[in-house]
Amino acid sequence: MKRTVIMMLDSFGVGAAGDAAKFGDVGSDTFGHIAKACAEGKADTGRKGPLALPNLARLGLAHAAMESTGAFAPGFADNVDLIGAYGHAQELSSGKDTPSGHWEMAGVPVLFEWGYFSEHQNSFPKELTDKILARAGLDGFLGNCHASGTTILEELGEEHMRSGKPIFYTSADSVFQIACHEGTFGLENLYRLCEIAREELEPYNIGRVIARPFDGTGPSDFARTGNRKDYSLEPPAKTVLDKLKAAGGEVVSVGKIADIYAYCGITKKVKANGLEALFDATLAEVKSAGENTIVFTNFVDFDSHYGHRRDVAGYAKGLEYFDARLPEMLALLDEDDLLILTADHGCDPTWQGTDHTREYVPVLAYGAGLKAGSLGRRNSFADIGQSIASYFKLEPMEYGESFI
């Protein structure tokens, strides 16, 4: 029986990519810097000691990172009984954003330039916001800037609740984000507003509109809820997900995968929030998955909760939780199944600012007859999509080189 499980550790980079200088990210290293902080006792909040990832290490994580950076991360060495094939991949796409990374690994790199709102204040054109407000029947909005999602709630959350004005903000990514209180503004109203924004943003070539619902009574307890929703553009070509679906296969999205691909190539969507629930849902879907199925999960917390918030200890604790549960996944796999663990970009929690970092991503592959050992440096994330196409005996993708 042929099944593929893709576990996307959102933002888990393994060292600055070859073109990191273009992005101001030379020296970034999500995995390496987390390991270093843990080894130095600087990440002991909620956990303690060196970073412990024995199962990821057996799958080749430390070796992939060593080949990327030239040295083993602190606390890791070459004394592991490897069971997986490992490599690291350079992104071909022009950006270091979520859609670019996901689409490329499914065989469709983003070779065009996204639109961006580069001004840190007064970020959005008045013509754009006027159209959105008019269609939504709103008399104003807050924000209009680059901001951290948690900080902007502390600064503007109360005013939003008083005025009913939505909070519009952006970042270094190609994104338009809208934060609204679930209780006072309403979740469905927020979703409708995002749909309007998605339509009006078409001429600007913005990759995503993101609904950022939150709850709470004031700055001290405002918190995002699990009802985030991404409104992405469709990939510019058929991904390997589309091809498997067209061939009669199943593609199961766990978490935000369906949103990232604008539902293209998806046959089933499973909602889950948080590392534990996402892992539970992934296991449940693998248990019930039949022949010619992809189960694809995005573990977004690594990015949204720890990377962007520059929470090194939280990131380390999350990785250790994920690692501790990996044996449950391995126990479910048949001999012919293919497991792939990877990332879509970096988000070094020790780096300046709050944005993503341009890094190599790990490519860890297990099963399907693959021999343990190095896959080397992959020239594109699309090698993953090409390998999946080869595995399922689908028509080859235009980009990528199979490692199967």
Swiss-Prot record:
Gene (UniProt): deoB
Residues that, per the record, bind Mn(2+) 1: 10, 344-345
Required co-factors: Mn(2+)
Subcellular location: Cytoplasm
UniProt record similarity statement: Belongs to the phosphopentomutase family.
GO MF annotations in UniProt: magnesium ion binding; manganese ion binding; phosphopentomutase activity
Cofactor-binding details, from the entry: Binds 2 manganese ions.
CDD domains, sorted: PPM
Any one biological process term the GO annotation gives: 5-phosphoribose 1-diphosphate biosynthetic process
Protein name stated in the entry: Phosphopentomutase
Source organism per UniProt: Shewanella oneidensis (strain ATCC 700550 / JCM 31522 / CIP 106686 / LMG 19005 / NCIMB 14063 / MR-1)
